[in-house]
């Protein structure tokens, strides 16, 4: 299953021309500094600085240091931050198209993820534009895994356990295996795993 992480920004902000002086943007992400997701976001910020000759400087705020992941979309929509990175499938309850890339086994390779992205991009961009957001780029995620402190040999082993759910699809998977879906922000996941919370 491939997920597409999305960078979004206020359309009005992007439409405004950059001033001759340096313009500074904040870009919050809920992911830690040395993760795949944040490294991609930092590369984007570096590329923008280079492409604009330093006229637009984007500061990446990793590890939910500026906003927690569930707050980022609203912070961008309300203009509290100029851009933000979040997983769009977390908003599949707003529109099923936002979760198309989290349907289990629909896109099981990078090439399949690219085809799915290409097919869904125009409709996704329109939905986001209707919400005052602009898609800047998407990144295919590597495969997902489940981690447990004890071996999970049968479906019965999941009964009553807590399972991190970050979108409607992972919530449904937890329900199907009779686990308890819980919301744990990525920045807090290490501690939750260590304490068994």
Explain the meaning of each model-derived region.
Residues 53-57, 72-86, 179-181, 195-197:
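Alpha-to-beta junction loops
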Residues 61-74, 166-169, 181-195:
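Short helix-initiation/N-cap motifs at beta->coil->alpha
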